[in-house]
Amino acid sequence: ADGALTPVTFELIVLENYDLANRLLKFATELPRHASEANKRILLVNLAQSYKFMNKQEQCLSTLSKVDWSACSDDFDLCVTVLKDQFKKAATIMRNIGPSGLIKRHDYIDWPIFKEFRKTSEFETTYTEIFGVEPTELLTQDTTPVSERNE
């Protein structure tokens, strides 16, 4: 069940329907079993980001504190770091991920989790350094809906 909720709740966050996404994600994260540990963590990150975009930073941080993220891959580490507004650390993690990591160049532009990070000079400088193009160029070029991109 939690596997089916992941794309639905992500799309709700993209559409800025944070309240509904939040309710579904609370349900999904409280299920007794999950498809995988990675899927459970994706749901927790999405729940935390729904709280963040509802201006409930305390609940965002509380959600993130429910699991130990220290042994996670860089992609999870980046998401958690961005949700905590630790943008200098996030830029370092971006460099570690590089141009061919799990998070692709369009993901940095499209994923709602990076919304606040994209507004920083750390993001613009690091993105340009990694991908050789300014992120603003991508923002103006691609009009394909996020859910239809494969890159």
Give names to the regions the model predicted.
Residues 2-121, 129-151:
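Alpha-helical protein-protein interaction modules
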